[in-house]
C-alpha cells in the first residue's frame, strides 16, 4: 500500500511538501532515511532512532540475503520483527551491491551471476529473485532490480551507447520486477528506478517509459557513482521534477547537507546516504555552521559541544533531568576528541547520533519552511550559516 498526498509547493523552485502513507506508518516528506545496511543503523538503538525523529529507514536486500538468510527472516515475519523497528522500511534491490563486486560478477540479460563475498558460493540474482527476497523481508518500499550504470570503468568514461544499453536492460528488468511483484501478491509498494548515466536524453527516455509502467513511486539512480559534482547536480536539476507530481520521488545515495537542500529544490521527496553515519565513524561532524573534524588537535581541550544549537543526546544531554536521577549536560568536543583518539566505541556512537540528528532536523526545518511558505528564506539562511565555519 502507498498513498502520497501533496500538501504544499514552493513557487520559486520545485520543492514540495507531502505525506507518504505506507503499511507501517505515515512519513512526512521531504525525508532523509538513515541507512541500516545489515538490519541496523550502525551503533544506534531503534529507540534512539525514534527519539531523533527517524520515520523510515533503509536496509540492504543483498547483504540480508547473504546473512542471516531468508529462512531466518521468514521465521521473524520479515525485517520489522527481526530488527525491532515498527516504522516503515525501504529495501534496495541489491543491484548496486552486485555491481560493486566487479570481477566477481557477470551480468547477463537473465540477471547477475556472482560469487558470494561471504563464502565464495556461486549465486544468481535476477529481477524475480530480488522481488522474492524483498517479499520475505516485507519492506514497505521495494526497489526494482536495475543495472547501476557506472560513470567510468578503469578510466574509460561510459559512452552514450553503453549507457543506453544499460538503461534499456534496466527497463526490461523493471517490467520483470513488476510482473514478479504482482505474481507474489506483495502488499507493499514497488518503485521504478530512472537510469541513463549522465545523458539527459536517456534520463528523459527512461523516466517516460517507467511512467508508462505506472509504478507507485520513482527513484533516480545511478548518481553519486564517481561522477564530478557538477554532472550530478545537472542530473538532479533535470530529472526529479519531470517525474509525476502525484507520486513520491526518491534520489538514491545522495548526499551532503547542501545536496539535500538542493535536491528538495529540484523536487525530490526522499533521500538516503551513508554519509552521516560513515563520516561520524571517521571523525567528520556535520553542524549548522559547517563541518567539524573532531580528530583535529585544536579540539583537545575544547569545552564546547559539537553544535551549540543542537538538541541531540551528544550535544544537549538529558536536559531537565536532575543529576541525582541520571541527568547530565552534553558532551564536550574535548571528550569526543579523547574518545576518538583512544578508539573507544562510545565516540562513534555519539557522533553518529549527532550526525543523524542533524540530518533529520535539517529535513524537519525544510518541511516547516515549506509549510510556512518560506523555503527561499530557509535556503539563504542555511547557506549563510554553513558558510560561517566552526
From Swiss-Prot:
Keyword Glycosyltransferase on entry: yes
Swiss-Prot/TrEMBL catalytic activity: 7-aminomethyl-7-carbaguanine + guanosine(34) in tRNA = 7-aminomethyl-7-carbaguanosine(34) in tRNA + guanine
Function summary: Catalyzes the base-exchange of a guanine (G) residue with the queuine precursor 7-aminomethyl-7-deazaguanine (PreQ1) at position 34 (anticodon wobble position) in tRNAs with GU(N) anticodons (tRNA-Asp, -Asn, -His and -Tyr). Catalysis occurs through a double-displacement mechanism. The nucleophile active site attacks the C1' of nucleotide 34 to detach the guanine base from the RNA, forming a covalent enzyme-RNA intermediate. The proton acceptor active site deprotonates the incoming PreQ1, allowing a nucleophilic attack on the C1' of the ribose to form the product.
GO terms (BP aspect): queuosine biosynthetic process; tRNA wobble guanine modification; tRNA-guanine transglycosylation
Family of this protein: Belongs to the queuine tRNA-ribosyltransferase family.
Matching PANTHER family: QUEUINE TRNA-RIBOSYLTRANSFERASE
Cofactor(s) the protein requires to work: Zn(2+)
Complexes and interactors: Homodimer. Within each dimer, one monomer is responsible for RNA recognition and catalysis, while the other monomer binds to the replacement base PreQ1.
Upper taxonomic lineage: Bacteria, Pseudomonadati, Pseudomonadota, Betaproteobacteria, Burkholderiales
Coiled coil ranges: none
RNA binding: annotated segments: 253-259, 277-281
Cofactor note: Binds 1 zinc ion per subunit.
Descriptive protein name: Queuine tRNA-ribosyltransferase
Disulfide bonds: none
Pathway: tRNA modification; tRNA-queuosine biosynthesis
Positions that bind Zn(2+): 310, 312, 315, 354
Cellular compartments per GO CC: cytosol
Binding-site positions, substrate: 92-96, 146, 195, 222
Keywords: Glycosyltransferase, Metal-binding, Queuosine biosynthesis, Transferase, tRNA processing, Zinc
Amino acid at each position: 500500500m502507498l498513498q502520497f498526498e501533496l500538501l504544499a509547493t514552493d513557487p520559486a523552485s520545485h520543492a514540495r511538501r507531502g505525506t507518504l502513507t505506507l503499511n507501517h506508518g505515515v512519513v512526512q516528506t521531504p525525508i532523509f532515511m538513515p541507512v541500516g545496511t545489515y538490519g541496523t543503523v550502525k551503533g544506534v538503538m531503534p529507540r534512539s532512532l525514534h527519539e531523533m525523529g527517524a520515520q523510515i529507514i533503509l536496509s540492504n536486500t543483498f547483504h540480508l540475503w547473504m546473512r542471516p538468510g531468508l529462512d531466518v527472516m521468514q521465521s521473524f515475519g520479515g525485517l520489522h520483527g527481526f530488527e525491532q523497528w515498527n516504522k516503515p522500511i525501504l529495501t534496495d534491490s541489491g543491484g548496486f551491491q552486485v555491481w560493486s563486486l566487479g570481477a566477481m560478477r557477470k551480468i547477463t540479460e537473465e540477471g547477475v551471476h556472482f560469487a558470494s563475498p561471504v563464502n565464495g558460493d556461486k549465486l544468481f540474482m535476477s529481477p524475480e529473485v530480488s522481488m522474492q527476497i524483498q517479499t520475505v523481508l516485507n519492506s514497505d518500499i521495494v526497489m526494482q532490480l536495475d543495472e547501476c550504470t557506472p560513470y567510468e570503468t578503469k578510466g574509460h568514461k561510459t559512452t552514450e551507447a553503453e549507457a543506453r544499453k544499460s538503461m534499456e536492460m534496466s527497463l526490461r528488468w523493471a517490467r520483470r520486477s513488476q510482473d514478479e511483484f504482482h505474481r507474489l501478491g506483495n502488499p507493499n509498494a514497488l518503485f521504478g528506478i530512472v537510469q541513463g548515466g549522465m545523458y539527459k536524453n536517456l534520463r528523459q527516455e527512461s523516466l517516460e517509459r517507467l511512467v508508462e509502467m505506472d509504478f507507485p513511486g520513482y527513484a533516480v539512480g545511478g548518481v553519486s557513482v564517481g561522477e564530478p559534482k557538477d554532472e550530478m547536480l545537472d542530473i538532479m536539476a533535470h530529472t526529479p521534477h519531470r517525474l509525476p507530481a502525484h507520486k513520491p520521488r526518491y534520489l538514491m545515495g545522495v548526499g551532503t547537507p547542501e545536496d539535500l537542500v538542493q535536491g528538495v529544490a529540484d523536487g525530490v521527496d526522499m533521500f538516503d546516504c551513508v554519509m552521516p553515519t560513515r563520516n561520524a565513524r571517521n571523525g567528520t561532524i556535520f553542524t549548522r555552521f559547517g563541518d567539524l573534524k573532531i580528530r583535529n588537535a585544536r579540539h583537545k581541550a575544547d569545552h564546547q559541544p559539537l553544535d551549540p544549537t543542537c538538541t541531540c543526546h551528544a550535544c544537549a544531554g538529558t536536559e531537565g533531568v536532575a543529576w541525582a536521577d541520571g541527568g547530565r549536560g552534553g558532551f564536550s568536543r574535548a571528550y569526543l576528541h579523547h574518545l576518538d583518539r583512544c578508539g573507544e566505541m562510545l565516540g562513534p556512537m555519539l557522533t553518529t547520533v549527532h550526525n543523524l540528528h542533524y540530518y533529520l532536523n535539517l529535513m524537519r526545518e525544510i518541511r516547516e519552511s515549506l509549510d510556512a511558505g518560506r523555503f527561499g528564506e530557509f535556503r539563504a539562511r542555511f547557506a549563510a550559516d554553513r558558510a560561517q565555519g566552526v
